[in-house]
Amino acid sequence: MSLATDSIFVTALQSNAELLYKLTESIDDDGTTVIDETPRLYGTAIGLPDEDAENVPVPYVIVTFDGLTNDQSTKDDRYESEYDTVNIGVEVTAKTLDDLHELTQMVRDTILSYLRTTDTAIQDYNFAAQQIQYDSLKPSYWQVLTYQCDVNNTNDDEQD
């Protein structure tokens, strides 16, 4: 289950229709609002289309699986501990700081609500946010939210 934790986050974000709509809107170079067919929500669970790889329209969200650890006590333990600590990154990118703040709050609220109301393997998590960055080439603002999740990695009958 630990290796699919990013899919839980993608599913959570897909459950918010308002967020998905905001991820379909963009403004082209002449200031015209453009509505795409699909939201720009990407990650290891939803690949980035090849044609967009170099120039993804803003705004977008990318969910990444950033590795895991397991607190196995010693090499002589018969089993690993029943929980993995899984790191998930959620990159939020927007055209303006106001848009970034709004999208970031929507992402945080959506994930929190989903994890509180949906039975998943995620038992608990810690949250951190990196500083806001500016990309002058795009131009856009972005921020990475990091979730460190305790994920149950065992089946009920696995350890006797």
Q: Language-model features: where?
A:
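Acidic-leaning, charged glycine-interspersed low-complexity segments
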Residues: 105-160
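"Short basic amphipathic alpha-helical interaction patches in structured regions
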Residues: 77-81, 103-108
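Oligomerization/assembly interface segments of phage tail-like spikes and tubes
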Residues: 80-98, 140-153
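Residue-level signal for secondary-structure boundary sites
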Residues: 70-71, 98-100, 153-157
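Hydrophobic beta-strand residues in large extracellular and virion-surface proteins
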Residues: 9, 13, 41, 61-63, ...
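Small/polar-rich, solvent-exposed N-terminal microdomains that initiate assembly or binding
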Residues: 1-74
